[in-house]
Amino acid sequence: MGVKHLEFILLTHPHQDHIGGMEKILSDTTIKIDKIYGNDLNIQYLKSSEDKSKQSSDETNWTEFDTKIYKNFKAALEARNKLAEEAEDKTEKENLKVDYVVPTAGETISLGEAKMTFYGPLENDYQYGRKVDLNTRQENKYSIVTKIVYGSNSFLMTGDAQKETIEKIIAKGYDLTAQVLKEPHHGFQDVTEEELANGYQYSDHKTVIDASQASIAIISNG
């Protein structure tokens, strides 16, 4: 595409389908990157067994995000900034340096004439949850939700946020109303077969749908 300057990048959470290209982008020193927004690089979350059949809220440990893709991203970011430190030319140093920023919930930044508000990261007190690949679900809870406002147009961007994420944002009193809602987790409904068999009729996303009052919802996969 020929893009050689990225003013900012937002990493919602450390999954392959959300940050998979970051290692390559950071390794391309011809691309200038001003800022990367994301969770604390050393954040810990409750994790259970890698064996899905053995995952249980009774057997969890606080663990750093340790997906291979996240480790590779952090290594690439460190390598990029090391090159910046070692560069002798001022312009080269500025073009290589990448600022990593952990946003504050409620913070608003300007994107030209648009504004983007961060609704995370929030307090790290998520409980270990329901029986649908609990480790993946747990990581998704840390998705950074944002709202972009441009004139009279508004867009709520949710990453792979879980119901618990949205509930916590609402409890903080943040305004999630928007014209357009990007459905969390590609529109995927994270309910168990047992719940469906017992007559569970509501999507996990009903909470954010109701809160956003959006007239348009975008589902990338479903």
Per-region residue spans from a language model:
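Acidic/histidine-rich helix-loop elements
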Residues: 128-135, 185-202
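Active-site metal-binding motif and surrounding structural segment of the metallo-beta-lactamase
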Residues: 1-38, 172-190, 213-217
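Extended active-site neighborhood of metal-dependent phosphoesterases/phosphodiesterases
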Residues: 51-119
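Core dinuclear metal-dependent hydrolase active-site scaffold
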Residues: 1-5, 88-180
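Active-site environment of divalent metal-dependent phosphoester hydrolases
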Residues: 14-20, 43-46, 162-167, 187-192, ...
